[in-house]
Amino acid sequence: MTPAELADTIVAAVRAAVANGDLEVAVPDSVTVERPRQPEHGDYASPVALQLAKAARRRPREVAELLAARLRAEAGVAEVEVAGPGFLNIRLAGAALGGIARRIVRDGESYGRAAVSQGVRVNLEFVSANPTGPVTLASARWAAVGDALSRVFAAAGYEVGTEYYVNDAGVQVERFGASVLAALRGQPAPADGYQGAYVAEIAAKVLAANPALEQLLAASGGEQDSGAEQDKALAVCARDGVELMLAEIRATLSGFGVEYDLWKSERSLHEAGELIAAIDELRTQGHVYEAGGAVWLRTTDFGDDKDRALIKSDGRPTYFCADAAYYRDKRRRGFDRLCYLLGADHHGYIGRLKAISACFGDDPDHNLDVLIGQMVTLSRGGVAVKMSKRAGNFLTLHDLVDAVGVDAARYSLVRASMDSALDLDLDAIARQTNDNPVFYVQYAHARISSLIRNAAALGLATSADPAFDVDGVDVSLLTHPREVDLLGALGELPRVVESAAELRAPHRIARYLEELAGTYHRFYDSCRVLPQGDEEPTAITAARLLLAEATRTVLANGLRLLGVSAPERM
């Protein structure tokens, strides 16, 4: 019996008490079930009686005694004790507790999934860095966290759409084009342009793809020429430079294990008239006005610190206008909730996006999530790593992966809460020792895989055998304290997934896996699984082997949620 199943059993007990007239309360949809800190308090505890007492106009202990009497009659419940002011301390029968291992092995990759958000469509946008340079270290964090969050959302029952918003319109594209053009001429980048060896690399590729560009360069007459040839050369450098940079970004993220459902071009919104359509709709809603030759959105009505311009006085749309059009575009595609993962320098966007949501008639608390993450720094041996050889004045995802590999990079970027600054010690996260969290978790999976291979070599049945009978294993024998601890930890995965999705906190998966790995290692050190020497396998051998297989399944499922591999050997 998993914690979720026990919670359902408690809800059923409340429902039965209400139906019988013993309680007069609204039956809750769900109740809290927790693992007590002290093993002597049972396998699980619930404060449900304290939560219902006020509405029932009864003392909490009275409510607890009513529910305890019903729970004691439930199959799989061995003992229920009312403790303190009205807590329910529940101990499961051996077969019910051990049944968690059986359930996990039977469910396989699907174990841990929930349907708590079934039918809700969520759009998750992350990274969305300008296509004017390599993927930076900060963007690497959002790539790892965003991809893990999309996997957690899916596991919690959401219908997820992931997007990268390509900022391929506006001033930054013009500056990048000017930087590429300067590199082609062997000149320094403009003061407001882009630096780094990568600009020269992109320039060489632009020239290789456009042989006629040499003639334009010659005809333009130099950097100060503002004639037609100069404009043509700038246009080619901007267009092709952005396309080449975007192709590199896509390849880098794909190599990092991050794939998107949609790469949405800002330019496409302009070309399709989506910005004008958004303004028209906002005008109809009564939130648009004109002043000083510009068109404004009255966002202060919805908590923003100032109204925002949609169209400048020179007639050009603002970035904010494109943001509003993009919000509208997502909602019109049927997404119920829009989730934006942004960097620390975008904190001001929270109020703006909430105002956009409200101006379109949505409830920001229901339709919008804006998650702000903090920055990442690298160090090696206590010394800060500050410079990328290729990018110049910033560090890149490639720098990190080149130093430690994809698995260590992804895990290390995800395991800390995104709202805390992160300093990664390259030596520490590449080290193959137990004080390195990613190694510790992956090693637990590899250790169990080795155990299962050894079991098969001894002729013992494992879940890999087509004829394996999971129901034939006597899981009631799993009563050793270390076995009970491990079973309790394994049962937590569905709730960890649910909370990670609800709180938008994929780091909870990583921390859970680290605790689980430690619990397994303690079990393995205390409970011998395979027979030694001339010993014959017994029923406890089969039960412990099943428990080990269940642990391997949960470790693999959790690592998959983080986009990290589960190695068979290390």
Curated annotation (Swiss-Prot):
It is an enzyme of class 6 (ligase). This is Arginine--tRNA ligase. One of its GO terms (biological process) is arginyl-tRNA aminoacylation. NCBIfam families: argS (TIGR00456). A motif ('HIGH' region) lies at residues 129-139. It holds the Pfam family DALR_1. PANTHER family: ARGININE--TRNA LIGASE, CYTOPLASMIC (PTHR11956:SF5), ARGINYL-TRNA SYNTHETASE (PTHR11956). CDD domains: ArgRS_core. It comes from the Bacteria. GO terms for cellular component: cytoplasm. InterPro entries: Arg-tRNA-ligase, Arg-tRNA-synth_N, Arg-tRNA-synth_N_sf, ArgRS_core, DALR_anticod-bd, Rossmann-like_a/b/a_fold, tRNAsynth_Ia_anticodon-bd. Belongs to the class-I aminoacyl-tRNA synthetase family. Its main location: cytoplasm. Its EC number is 6.1.1.19. GO terms for molecular function: arginine-tRNA ligase activity; ATP binding. Monomer. Keywords: Aminoacyl-tRNA synthetase, ATP-binding, Cytoplasm, Ligase, Nucleotide-binding, Protein biosynthesis. It catalyses: tRNA(Arg) + L-arginine + ATP = L-arginyl-tRNA(Arg) + AMP + diphosphate. SMART domains: Arg_tRNA_synt_N, DALR_1. It comes from Parafrankia sp. (strain EAN1pec). The keyword Transit peptide does not apply. It is found in: Cytoplasm. HAMAP family: Arg_tRNA_synth.
